[in-house]
C-alpha cells in the first residue's frame, strides 16, 4: 500500500448529545459544522479515540466499474427499496393506504427510498424470529459474490487505519457463526443508499467498540451529501472511490443535494455503501440450527391448528 500524507486533527465535543437528539430525523444545515474535510485525514477526539479516518481514492476506476452493476441493483430492483426508513431519510409525512372498505388505514408507511441491506441480519421478532440471509443474497448470489473483492479491500484498509478497532471487530467475528459473517472481512452486513441523504441518526445496533466503513460512488454534476458530525462540528466531503472509517454510534447525517444537473440516478448519482458488524449476530445460532428451530416452530404451529 502506497504511503499517504494525512491531515491529523484533534476535535473537541462542542454540542451535547442530548441536544443533538432533538435533531433526530432532520437533515443538517451549514451552520451545524465549522469546517469540511476534503482529503486524507485522521480525526480523533480529546481522548485520542478515532472519530473518522478518510482515505482518498482507494479504488481504481476499473474496480469501481466492475462492482457498480451489483450495487446499482439496489435501485433498479425496487424489491430492495425501503418504506420503513422515514426517520432515517428525514420524511415527516407518512402515506396511509385506503382499505377495501374505503376507510383509511391508521398504519402509515413512508415514501419508498432506494436504501437496502445485504448480508446477514439477526432475529428482530415479528416475521423475523430467526437470523437470516437477506433477499439480495438469495436473488442475486453471483452479483453478491462479485462484491467480495470490494469488501475485502475495505477490511484490509481497516486493519491499516484502525488496527486496534479492527482486532476487536475480528474477535467479535470469531465469536460469531461463520454463517453470519461476510467471508474474509470484519463485516456482517452492508447498507446501500442510492441518492439517499441520511437525516441525523445513530447506528446503535453496530458494534460500538469496532468501526463502520463507507465507500462512495459519484458521477455527474451535483453538490451536497457532505457527512456532518455535529457533536464535533465538522463535515466530510466523500469523493468517488473514497473510503471512510468512522464511529457509527455518534450522531451523523448528510447534507441535502443541491445544484444537481439533470435527472437523479440517471444524469447524476451518488451511491454510498456502508459496511458494519451487527453486534447481536454474535448471539445467533449457526444457520443449520436456526433452520431446525424454524421447522420445529412451524410443526408446533401446524399441530396447534389441528388440535
Predicted segments with their positions:
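Short, conserved beta-strand element in jelly-roll/cupin
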Residues: 205-222
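Ordered, helix-dominated protein-protein interaction surfaces in large eukaryotic regulatory proteins
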Residues: 217, 229, 243-246, 256, ...
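Residue-level detector of short, conserved catalytic/binding motifs and their immediate flanks
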Residues: 211-213, 225, 242, 271
Amino acid at each position: 500500500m502506497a504511503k499517504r500524507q494525512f491531515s491529523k486533527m484533534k476535535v473537541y465535543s462542542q454540542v451535547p448529545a442530548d441536544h443533538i437528539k432533538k435533531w433526530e430525523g432532520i437533515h443538517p444545515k451549514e451552520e451545524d459544522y465549522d469546517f469540511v474535510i476534503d482529503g486524507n485525514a485522521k480525526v480523533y477526539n480529546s481522548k485520542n479515540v478515532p472519530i473518522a479516518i478518510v482515505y482518498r481514492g482507494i479504488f481504481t476506476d476499473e474496480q469501481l466499474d466492475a462492482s457498480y452493476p451489483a450495487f446499482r441493483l439496489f435501485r433498479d430492483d425496487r424489491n430492495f427499496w425501503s418504506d420503513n426508513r422515514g426517520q432515517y431519510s428525514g420524511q415527516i409525512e407518512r402515506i396511509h393506504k385506503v382499505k377495501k372498505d374505503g376507510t383509511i388505514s391508521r398504519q402509515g408507511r413512508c415514501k419508498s427510498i432506494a436504501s437496502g441491506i445485504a448480508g446477514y441480519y439477526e432475529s428482530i421478532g415479528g416475521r423475523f424470529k430467526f437470523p437470516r440471509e437477506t433477499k439480495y443474497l438469495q436473488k442475486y448470489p453471483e452479483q453478491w459474490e462479485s462484491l467480495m473483492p470490494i469488501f475485502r479491500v475495505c477490511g484490509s484498509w481497516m486493519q491499516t487505519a484502525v488496527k486496534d478497532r479492527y482486532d476487536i471487530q475480528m474477535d467479535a467475528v470469531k465469536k460469531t457463526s461463520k454463517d453470519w459473517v461476510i467471508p474474509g472481512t470484519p463485516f456482517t452486513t452492508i447498507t446501500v443508499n442510492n441518492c439517499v441523504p441520511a437525516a441525523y441518526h445513530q447506528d446503535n445496533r453496530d458494534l460500538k467498540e469496532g468501526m463502520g466503513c463507507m465507500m462512495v460512488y459519484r458521477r455527474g454534476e451535483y453538490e451536497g451529501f457532505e457527512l456532518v458530525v455535529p457533536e464535533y462540528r465538522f463535515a466530510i466531503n466523500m469523493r468517488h472511490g473514497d473510503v471512510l472509517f468512522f464511529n457509527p454510534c455518534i450522531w451523523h447525517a448528510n447534507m441535502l443535494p443541491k445544484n444537481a444537473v439533470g435527472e437523479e440516478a440517471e444524469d447524476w448519482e451518488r451511491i454510498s455503501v456502508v459496511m458494519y458488524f451487527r453486534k447481536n449476530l454474535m448471539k445467533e445460532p449457526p444457520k443449520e440450527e436456526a433452520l431446525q428451530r424454524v421447522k420445529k416452530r412451524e410443526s408446533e404451529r401446524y399441530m396447534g391448528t389441528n388440535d
